[in-house]
């Protein structure tokens, strides 16, 4: 992965491959973002033809919006905070169901400069949800706020791309 971030060749290539596979399969994606603040959706919608594959996105930056808009259980948020693997999973499921997409992608984590919910800067959880399963990955990323956010976008797109390729096999 490159450090150039959304709009970089790697990000564009990943997003392009995702859109191509979604379109070929007649499938769609919806995105729920916290620390990336819409960057995953922006990377996807930069690709021509994305309107046939991207249902939309929700930027639930505030913790209470994760419950209100994405059906993340309030109890989970109260007990664990927003930076927790099961929160990423619930966000991905929630956005997929709420926006009526084949796949849901979610990002939550700590971009910095300060720790959050007892988690150090660079702790990130990403998830991809489909009807039959939800996959969550925990990342420990280094760098400043911008680099952590850029890497999260690339890793999220790569996780979705991997899931799409599994469907082809």
Language model regions located:
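Short alpha-helical segments enriched in small residues
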Residues: 1-169
């Amino acid at each position: 992965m490159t450090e150039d971030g959304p709009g970089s060749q790697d990000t564009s290539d990943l997003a392009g491959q995702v859109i191509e596979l979604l379109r070929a399969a007649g499938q769609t994606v919806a995105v729920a973002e916290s620390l990336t603040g819409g960057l995953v959706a922006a990377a996807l919608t930069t690709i021509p033809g994305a309107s046939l594959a991207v249902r939309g996105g929700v930027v639930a930056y505030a913790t209470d919006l994760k419950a209100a808009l994405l059906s993340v259980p309030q109890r989970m948020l109260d007990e664990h905070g927003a930076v927790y693997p099961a929160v990423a999973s619930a966000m991905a499921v929630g956005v997929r169901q709420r926006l009526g997409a084949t796949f849901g992608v979610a990002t939550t984590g700590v971009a910095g400069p300060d720790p959050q919910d007892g988690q150090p800067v660079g702790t990130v959880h990403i998830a991809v949800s489909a009807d039959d399963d939800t996959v969550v990955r925990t990342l420990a990323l280094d760098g400043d706020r911008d680099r952590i956010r850029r890497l999260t976008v690339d890793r999220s797109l790569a996780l979705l791309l991997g899931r799409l390729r599994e469907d082809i096999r």
